[in-house]
Amino acid sequence: MSQTSLHHARLDWNEAGTPVSSDFGDVYFSNDNGLSETRYVFLQQNGLPARFSHHNSDSFVIGETGFGTGLNFLATMKAFLEQAPQTGNGARLHFISFEKFPLTRDDLHKALTAWPELAPFSQALIAQWPLPVPGCHRLHFAGGRIRLDLWLGDIKEMLPQVPHGEQGLVDTWYLDGFAPAKNPEMWTQDLFDGLARLARPGATLSTFTSAGFVRRGLIAAGFAMKKVKGHGSKWAMLAGERVDKKPQRTIVPWYARPAGRDGEVVIIGGGIASAMTALSLVERGRKVTLLCEDHELATGASGNRQGALYPLLNGEHDALSRFYSLAFGYARQRLLSLAKHHPIAFDLCGVVQLGYDDKSTAKLAKMQQGPFPHALMRPLTPVEAEHECGLPSGHAGVSYPLGGWLCPADLTRAAIKEAQASGLLQVEYDCPVTAIHEQVDGWLVASREGRQWQAPNLVVAAGHQLPALSPFAELPLYPVRGQVSHVPTTATLSQLKTVLCYDGYLTPAHNAEHCIGASYGRNQSTQAFSAEEQAQNQARLQACLPDQAWPAEVDVSSNEARVGVRCASRDHLPVAGPIARLAGLADHYARLQRDQQNPAPLPLHPGLYVLGALGSRGLCSAPLCGELIASEICGDPLPLATDLLEALHPARYWIRKLLKGKPLN
């Protein structure tokens, strides 16, 4: 996928107050009541909102080719909430849209003031409006009943990356955008073919244009199209539906992510990963039982007082960087939403990362070559770094202005309380799981005390204890011990305004104490206090800032600290998804290196999922990974591009070897 930076739309405003694209010379919506045109062209011609009432699956999926001001989405959301059934688990709306030139937040606000009847929905959109970072940004509305996947970037690149199975994904297409004469690069046969590929059998489509080449192109792609009366004074427009659906998919069989079984889900875990997964599942109406090993939540790696929240980026903007740039935005969204109703200690005060030696300086310099807006990451001179964080370092660095710190345990508890409010989540404490057993129609989970639970679906989010449970022992994961020191603030240390990252990190004061850490003990899982690591936490700060006096005020002598054990992977990415049957996998894919045309699907343990290896970035990655697992189980659209799904797939370690013709060992 392209690493090109995104640019905000450049707007003019005409006499009617309508936004006009400076680059394309076209209006974003009709001067003559654009909302009325939206309702006629896209809702009425697609049989909406009536189809919402009798849709035969939990989630109705709409795709749109040009998000613009979001008018189509907002009008659809209003109609859905007015029409869709409220009984049972409730129908859900999933809206997928693409935008190459997103509006600024201020321009979006100005444009949407034209529609006061949509104000509550507009405000929710503006509050979550993402940064111009390429990829899929998932936003939640109406308590999770409505999800918007906003794919920022060129639709020619993004559309082939939308994951879907053989029978498509989309129930209705809104073919919108600037007029074909104004933006001919978008209106191509490749686009029409892509819409057909993602369309489910019988999916409908409508568009404001009646251009002959558009009609012919859609027919060639597999739609039955007709001209109908246009809106208002417009003579005609196009409407139709998908016919002659041929099985096509974007997820290759060896990275399969089939939907889970209907019914309940059991989750093993008690930290941020399991909490976020549970929340995303109950938002979809699933009953969940969470099995927590301890007598309370977040006693493991999720139990630190303060954890830094910022993205892991690099100049190549590879899969790692792309995933974390999107996960960061989603984590912020989840945090701010939960903090409205639950007590969470946090401060999005920013994060400053220093180039403290030649290697780290070169790494930051290369990172600045990536396609990142300054609102996500911007370079700092030594003077700017001091001004930003409040204390001198003598080093240049970068700022993550939207980052900060939060209490992981508070976030974990908030997610669980929010999920419990639905009445669909039951938490069982003091349940150390010792074995899981596959059954014909689900999974049996057994605890040390002999208690048992059964469910069609099982998610294991047990942190560094994952390898202790079969069939997870073969995953190439490892434990990482980390000790965080708690130090009292001083008059000088209290001037620290942001999280400061170097060869370690130091948080601003909270309750008159700072957190400094953390030690890194690979393949170590002991949790006893270490005086040596306590001293090392302070020594690393002094070593990185040798010319500064204030690090000497960091006093670790009280031996106040907390030890946690994280679970990590070799490639620093989480494992999130279904679990493959390793026995016979090499024989199953013996010819995969040479023949990738008709391979059999990946042999999986049905209904079994894993979420782990979050490492030291769990605050950033857990919310999006939990949403991914829930989407997968429920058969919903997935919130990441296909190549990122491959990068997170638990089977990636073995599939990569098989694709290279290497033996599995």
Swiss-Prot record:
In the N-terminal section; belongs to the methyltransferase superfamily. tRNA (mnm(5)s(2)U34)-methyltransferase family. In the C-terminal section; belongs to the DAO family. The keyword Transit peptide does not apply. Keywords: Cytoplasm, FAD, Flavoprotein, Methyltransferase, Multifunctional enzyme, Oxidoreductase, S-adenosyl-L-methionine, Transferase, tRNA processing. Residues 268-665 are annotated as: FAD-dependent cmnm(5)s(2)U34 oxidoreductase. It is found in: Cytoplasm. Its cofactor is FAD. Its main location: cytoplasm. The lineage of its organism: Bacteria, Pseudomonadati, Pseudomonadota, Gammaproteobacteria, Aeromonadales. It holds the Pfam family Methyltransf_30. GO terms for biological process: methylation; tRNA wobble uridine modification. It comes from Aeromonas salmonicida (strain A449). GO terms for cellular component: cytoplasm. This is tRNA 5-methylaminomethyl-2-thiouridine biosynthesis bifunctional protein MnmC. Residues 1-243 are annotated as: tRNA (mnm(5)s(2)U34)-methyltransferase. Catalyzes the last two steps in the biosynthesis of 5-methylaminomethyl-2-thiouridine (mnm(5)s(2)U) at the wobble position (U34) in tRNA. Catalyzes the FAD-dependent demodification of cmnm(5)s(2)U34 to nm(5)s(2)U34, followed by the transfer of a methyl group from S-adenosyl-L-methionine to nm(5)s(2)U34, to form mnm(5)s(2)U34. It catalyses: 5-aminomethyl-2-thiouridine(34) in tRNA + S-adenosyl-L-methionine = 5-methylaminomethyl-2-thiouridine(34) in tRNA + S-adenosyl-L-homocysteine + H(+). Its EC number is 2.1.1.61, 1.5.-.-. InterPro entries: FAD-dep_OxRdtase (IPR006076), FAD/NAD-bd_sf (IPR036188), MnmC-like_methylTransf (IPR008471), SAM-dependent_MTases_sf (IPR029063), tRNA_MAMT_biosynth_bifunc_MnmC (IPR023032), tRNA_MNMC2 (IPR047785), tRNA_S-uridine_synth_MnmC_C (IPR017610). PANTHER family: SARCOSINE DEHYDROGENASE-RELATED, TRNA 5-METHYLAMINOMETHYL-2-THIOURIDINE BIOSYNTHESIS BIFUNCTIONAL PROTEIN MNMC. HAMAP family: MnmC. GO terms for molecular function: flavin adenine dinucleotide binding; oxidoreductase activity, acting on the CH-NH group of donors; tRNA (5-methylaminomethyl-2-thiouridylate)(34)-methyltransferase activity.
